[in-house]
Amino acid sequence: MNIYAVGGAIRDDLLGVPVQDRDYVVVGATPEQMVAQGFRPVGKDFPVFLHPDTQEEYALARTERKTAAGYHGFQFYFAPDVTLDEDLARRDLTINAMAREVSPEGALVGPVIDPFDGQADLHARVFRHVGDAFVEDPVRILRIARFAARFADFTVADDTLALMRRMVDAGEADALVAERVWQEIARGLMEAKPSRMFAVLRECGALARVLPEVDALWGVPQRADYHPEVDTGVHVMMVVDYAAKQGYSLPVRFAALTHDLGKATTPADVLPRHVGHEGRSVELIKPLCERLRVPNECRDLALVVAREHGNLHRVMEMGAAALVRFFERSDALRKPARFAEMLQACESDARGRLGLDTQPYPQAERLRVALVAARSVDAGAIARGVGDDVMQIKDAVHRARVEAVKQALAIGE
């Protein structure tokens, strides 16, 4: 048998990018031989094994044939007679269809095996499909878009983009399971330039199928005095990219993506103003998250950011009582960590605008100082001093928090 490192590990090594983990293909072996050498079988649809020492995954070389629509509609063939080139031919992109042999000690040996000119495409910074079988797996649309977010200076080859459009037109994107859509979108959001993912999805028409709420934002105008970039879709991409540049978490980046969804449903006769878009955004985020099975922490932050980001931008105008009400409404007193992420998302919103990416955002510091003061109030001690009347306790605690915030910010009211 021969063992090869394949795919992303070879690509990243050639690019000079740190290799996170490796995928291995075994040619000329049977499942029984793998087990005899101590490998543990874990594959469900095709033979994948864990190395007895490193626990890395090793897959037997295989070919695959499309048998039904969607992500799971494949029939796999694996046997000792499947060659390395045949295994590489089933892969999505030429830059992912390269291999190097692995020595018994685990070192890469010999030249790069590159039957589809992946090295040339790496040099040209091009995503190019390996063959016509590319159209058989709709997940590849999402994967290419995600790769675009990681390798932002790459472009999609014209013929590859044409195939992606054909797949979308044929309804293949509609067959994607929700969990896989979210998985790829989430991974793309965590790359260096998430806007590139959405640009590729828009180019091939897939964004309108998997995230129609986001796709609808392009072409929706905003007031130029607040948004020099004008177009809502452009603004949202700038917000997401700003959040990525700051290294913010997935919940923050998802909130950045969804905070203005309601602007797409603003009546045409009131544009470019968007009165009430916050509430409309909330009503769009809820079914989106349910449809894609978005994790609760992402959904909850997105909802509070969508509802409150306009208010948060205006906190410099708020007195102590209004600030405490804002904290109570956004659950900041009980969930300060989530509130910190809310500040990050709103700061990204303020700076994700043409020419305004370095503008001061004093709202964040004002809220941090005020929240520390409000949370310093000992609600338990106040409750013990007031008695059993719940409303009296709430009122006394609220007044104490207002006074604490007033003193912390030296606000005269």
Swiss-Prot record:
Please tell me where CTP binds in this chain.
8, 11, 91, 143, 146
The cross-references to InterPro entries, in alphabetical order and at most eight, read: CCA_bact, HD_domain, NT_sf, PolA_pol_head_dom, PolyA_RNA-bd, tRNA_CCA-adding_enzyme
Task: Please indicate if the UniProt record lists Magnesium as a keyword.
Answer: yes
Q: Which reaction does it catalyse?
A: a tRNA precursor + 2 CTP + ATP = a tRNA with a 3' CCA end + 3 diphosphate; a tRNA with a 3' CCA end + 2 CTP + ATP = a tRNA with a 3' CCACCA end + 3 diphosphate
Give the required cofactors. Answer: Mg(2+); Ni(2+)
Q: What is known of its domains?
A: Comprises two domains: an N-terminal domain containing the nucleotidyltransferase activity and a C-terminal HD domain associated with both phosphodiesterase and phosphatase activities.
Additional free-text comment from the UniProt record:
A single active site specifically recognizes both ATP and CTP and is responsible for their addition.
The UniProt function text for this chain reads: Catalyzes the addition and repair of the essential 3'-terminal CCA sequence in tRNAs without using a nucleic acid template. Adds these three nucleotides in the order of C, C, and A to the tRNA nucleotide-73, using CTP and ATP as substrates and producing inorganic pyrophosphate. tRNA 3'-terminal CCA addition is required both for tRNA processing and repair. Also involved in tRNA surveillance by mediating tandem CCA addition to generate a CCACCA at the 3' terminus of unstable tRNAs. While stable tRNAs receive only 3'-terminal CCA, unstable tRNAs are marked with CCACCA and rapidly degraded.
What name does UniProt use for this protein? Multifunctional CCA protein
